[in-house]
Regions:
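Non-catalytic accessory segments flanking enzymatic or RNA/DNA-binding domains
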Residues: 1-125
Length: 125
């Protein structure tokens, strides 16, 4: 499961964990800022890496990213279902629009990212 954990008003962690609530508790230990689990969505390790690629220009340290307007709007406006076997339409569109831009620059060698794009691509008619 993909999780988004906010630290204050400036940073967000994009990560992958089978148990995001447990991961939040682990990260909170020793952290002076109050962390908040903003949302989760169904996804794989490859989905996490695709999101990291998309927001690479805002990367701070590790899996922490500067909370830009774009990322904040994505977190506020997107409806990402938490139920099993439900495809999140918003994340499909997000990945389709974002990854194609970065694929030519950062991920040409990655078969996993290419497969992810094929998996989430949506034909519009």
């Amino acid at each position: 499961m993909i999780y988004f954990i906010k630290a204050g008003n400036k940073h967000v962690k994009i990560g992958y964990s089978a148990n995001p609530e447990k991961r939040l508790k682990e990260l909170q230990t020793g952290n002076p800022l109050k962390l908040k689990l903003v949302t989760t969505l169904l996804g794989s390790y490859e989905t996490e890496k695709a999101l990291h690629l998309y927001f690479a220009r805002n990367k701070r340290e590790g899996e922490w990213f500067h909370l830009t307007g774009e990322l904040e709007n994505c977190l506020k406006a997107s409806i990402w279902p938490k139920r099993k076997n439900v495809e999140p339409t918003t994340i499909k569109q997000f990945l389709e629009n974002g990854i194609h831009f970065h694929l030519s620059q950062k991920a040409k060698r990655s078969k996993k990212v290419k497969n992810l794009i094929r998996q989430y691509s949506v034909e519009t008619k």
